[in-house]
Design a protein with these regions (language model features):
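Conserved short histidine dyad/triad with adjacent acidic residue
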Residues: 27, 41-56
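Short beta-strand His + acidic residue motifs that chelate non-heme Fe in jelly-roll/DSBH
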Residues: 53, 72-73, 89, 95-101, ...
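A short, N-terminal "cap"/entry segment at the start of jelly-roll beta-barrel domains
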Residues: 1-38, 127, 132, 136
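Double-stranded beta-helix
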Residues: 100-136
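Hydrophobic small-molecule pocket/channel-lining residues, especially in calycin-type beta-barrels
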Residues: 32, 49, 57, 69-70
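Short strand-connecting beta-turns/loops that link adjacent beta-strands
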Residues: 33-34, 58, 102-103
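Glycine- and acidic-residue-biased ligand/ion/polar-headgroup-sensing regions
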Residues: 58-70, 75
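Short acidic-glycine-tyrosine-enriched beta hairpin
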Residues: 9-12, 76-94
């Protein structure tokens, strides 16, 4: 890994690069650039905007619920996760979520490893945001 190309930085609440890709996603740590091994996004969603059940073949996904309540399905298991809750979704297992709370749900999502050159699925999604998303 080329650590010289990576610099230390801190972001305040609400900071990051925000792109609209149907909904606004704020990139806290992107996929583009040498040495990237993790991608971190914050976004707000609501009932009706949930993704379909899907599988990531190359990366694990971690959700930290900043606000709201969701039900996650991962394989045959179901988990209720609320404010301050965390869920780890391993690669290779079909998963998705449904929103249980009224109003906005705020999520911090971490994927590892990031996949800037991947096509399809989550792999490369953050890189796509950074190159194709409309700045919000």
């Amino acid at each position: 890994m080329d650590n010289e190309a990576i610099r230390t930085y801190a972001l305040k609440s609400g900071e990051g690069r925000t792109y609209n890709y149907g909904i606004d996603f704020t990139v806290k740590a992107g996929e583009l650039g040498p040495g990237r091994r993790v991608a971190v996004l914050e976004y707000t969603t609501r009932s009706g905007e949930e993704p379909p059940q899907h599988t990531h073949t190359t990366e694990d996904e971690i959700f930290y619920v900043l606000q709201g309540a969701l039900t996650f399905r991962c394989g045959d298991d179901t988990f209720d996760v609320e404010d301050g809750g965390f869920i780890f979704l391993p690669r290779g297992i079909e998963h998705g979520y449904s929103i249980r709370s009224a109003g906005d749900v705020r999520l911090l999502v971490i994927t590892s490893p990031s996949q800037p050159d991947a096509t399809g699925g989550w792999g490369g999604f953050v890189g796509d945001l950074e190159t194709q998303g409309e700045p919000a």
